[in-house]
């Protein structure tokens, strides 16, 4: 079972395609600001559960680079990763034990501002290039290129971080640096 907590589109497509190729359940979780999503993508029957759509059935193509802000740029309600992670864990337990109804063919949408949880149905795409009737993607591809990034390129939404130890080393070496502190004043 693959449980995904990434916020990087190229990694999500890689994870999905690997899960489909290997026949593994893929438990997807996504967060942004006050909202989250959870689903179970299952390309082959597993422990008594029928197959359902994959991530590409729902999102056939990634958004253009920089079109979707990162969690660091848009912010995230502090408890939301824990909520989504707990729901993903519950889905994993249901798959392992073979009980209840996992979110196969469904996506749970969480809005913590309104404190609303709703579930929507999602369909398998028979023309999906990975899990469809005649798949055209049967091995892993260059996901950075697929998502519009050149190999090794940092997208506009990626953040550059430096640890306190790295900063001290640069200051001690008198390297010319520019440090911008974007923390909120207290």
Stretches with model-predicted labels:
Residues 1-84, 97, 114-116, 121-126, ...:
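E1/E1-like adenylate-forming module used to activate ubiquitin-like modifiers
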Residues 5-8, 92, 182:
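Generic detector of well-ordered alpha-helical packing
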Residues 17, 94, 186:
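Surface-exposed charge patches
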Residues 25, 34-36, 103, 173-176:
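Short, basic and Ser/Thr-rich N-terminal targeting/leader segments
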Residues 85-103:
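Internal hydrophobic alpha-helix adjacent to the cofactor/substrate pocket in enzyme cavities
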Residues 104-115:
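Intrinsically disordered, low-complexity Ser/Thr-enriched
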Residues 114-186:
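Flexible, polar/low-complexity N-terminal or interdomain linker segments that lie immediately upstream
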């Amino acid at each position: 079972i693959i449980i995904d907590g990434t916020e990087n589109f190229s990694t999500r497509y890689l994870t999905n395609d690997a899960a489909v190729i290997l026949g593994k359940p893929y438990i997807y979780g996504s967060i942004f600001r006050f909202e989250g999503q959870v689903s179970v993508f299952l390309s082959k029957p597993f422990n008594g559960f029928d197959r359902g759509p994959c991530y590409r059935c729902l999102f056939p193509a990634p958004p253009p680079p920089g079109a979707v802000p990162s969690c660091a740029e848009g912010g995230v309600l502090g408890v939301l990763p824990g909520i989504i992670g707990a729901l993903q864990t519950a889905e994993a337990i249901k798959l392992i034990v073979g009980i209840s109804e996992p979110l196969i063919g469904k996506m749970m949408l969480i809005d913590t501002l309104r404190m609303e949880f709703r579930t929507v149905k999602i369909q398998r795409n028979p023309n999906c290039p990975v899990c469809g009737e005649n798949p055209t993607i049967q091995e892993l591809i260059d996901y950075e290129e697929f998502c519009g990034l050149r190999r090794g390129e940092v997208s506009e939404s990626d953040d550059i971080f430096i640890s306190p130890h790295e900063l001290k080393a640069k200051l001690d070496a008198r390297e010319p640096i520019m440090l911008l502190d974007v923390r909120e004043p207290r």
